[in-house]
């Protein structure tokens, strides 16, 4: 069995709980219980907490507020703790939009300071509950994005190392 990215999902139907989730992802205490404020971000880059709250307040009636955690496998995907988690998150959320055939609003924060596995918390506003097959598809999308990025980063590192070894050899001959 191939290790896969961890993709957890829970949901709420209340704006109050959604806002509590935003506070949590922005202000969860860091390592050694240190107070930390993390940047919130979405499709358009950095987002202020008041903007995230406004997004929740303006959600269509009946919206479902999904909380996702996207965490590349540290043993096979984020082996060097160097993956661009924002890119993986954006690819995953784009996959969700494709499945739902509509744009969705979401806010995220990267948590890379309090656990051995780096991860991203996302609060997404959806028109309906997701089914098990949707969640499995999102996990697959996150895994593929992480593995592809791992391959590209390892390839680039390998080429840089080879180039670095060849360069002194070339200099010796000229």
Show which residues each predicted segment covers.
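N-terminal nicking endonuclease/strand-transfer module with a His-rich metal-binding environment
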Residues: 1-174
């Amino acid at each position: 069995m191939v290790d896969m990215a961890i993709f957890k999902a829970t949901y709420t139907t209340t704006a109050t709980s959604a806002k509590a989730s935003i506070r949590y992802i922005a202000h969860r205490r860091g390592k050694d219980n240190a107070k930390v404020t993390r940047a919130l971000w979405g499709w358009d880059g950095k987002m202020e907490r008041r903007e995230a709250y406004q997004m929740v307040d303006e959600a269509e009636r009946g919206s479902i507020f999904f909380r996702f955690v996207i965490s590349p496998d540290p043993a096979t995907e984020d082996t060097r703790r160097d993956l661009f988690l924002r890119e993986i998150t954006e690819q995953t959320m784009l996959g969700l939009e494709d499945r739902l055939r509509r744009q969705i609003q979401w806010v995220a924060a990267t948590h890379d300071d309090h656990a051995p596995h780096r991860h991203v918390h996302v609060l997404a506003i959806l028109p309906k509950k997701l089914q098990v097959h949707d969640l499995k598809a999102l996990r697959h999308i996150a895994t593929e994005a992480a593995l592809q990025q791992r391959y590209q980063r390892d390839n680039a590192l390998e080429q840089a190392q080879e180039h670095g070894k060849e360069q002194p050899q070339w200099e010796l001959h000229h």
